[in-house]
């Protein structure tokens, strides 16, 4: 009988060892998981990096600013800024008694390339609250001696907007053609709605 007791004890000990080994294995898996998730945070503030250099109006790339040969005054800077606005140069024209249309010359760059006249606006507020750009002509054109050029008009055509970031942020309301009234109210050129 003592042999039978030894076998039963030995069998019971083997079963107990198997259960402990099995439990240890499961426990090891729980201690070393295969996946771990964590959280990260970032806070954005409105930018105020100064004036953004002008970019090519037809192929805007912030890493390739253009270099105008006769730049206008520096832009406004700030979180919402007008960075660049072309000078309108109509050249020397012959006086005529007939109605004439004169076109502003393209902006000449220091590399010799020519770009259409344009205005560049940068919005670094991060609010998507929209903005508007209006233009005005404070008074009628005048000759060098100060005489008004009666009936002269400043007309903008083919207006369009381009976004450097994503087409989703391109202003949807762009006045593609507008005529200014000398001494009149501001005329809306672009409305970047929120």
Regions found by a protein language model. Give the residues of each.
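Bacterial N-terminal signal peptides
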Residues: 12-21
């Amino acid at each position: 009988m003592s042999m039978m007791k030894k076998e039963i004890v030995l069998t019971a000990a083997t079963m107990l060892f198997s259960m402990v080994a099995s439990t240890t294995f499961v426990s090891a898996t729980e201690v070393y998981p295969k996946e771990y998730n964590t959280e990260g945070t970032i806070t954005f503030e409105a930018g105020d990096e100064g004036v953004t250099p002008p970019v090519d109006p037809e192929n805007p790339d912030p890493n390739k600013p253009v270099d105008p040969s006769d730049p206008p005054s520096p832009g406004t800077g700030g979180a919402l800024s007008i960075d660049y606005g072309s000078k309108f140069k109509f050249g020397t024209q012959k006086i005529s008694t007939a109605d004439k249309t004169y076109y502003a010359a393209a902006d000449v760059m220091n590399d010799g390339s020519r770009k259409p006249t344009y205005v560049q606006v940068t919005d670094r507020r991060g609010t998507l609250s929209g903005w508007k750009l209006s233009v005005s002509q404070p008074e009628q054109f005048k000759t060098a001696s100060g005489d008004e050029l009666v009936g002269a008009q400043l007309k903008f055509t083919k207006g369009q907007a381009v976004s450097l970031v994503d087409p989703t942020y391109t202003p949807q309301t762009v006045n593609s053609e507008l005529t200014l009234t000398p001494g009149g109210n501001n005329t809306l050129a672009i409305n970047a709605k929120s």
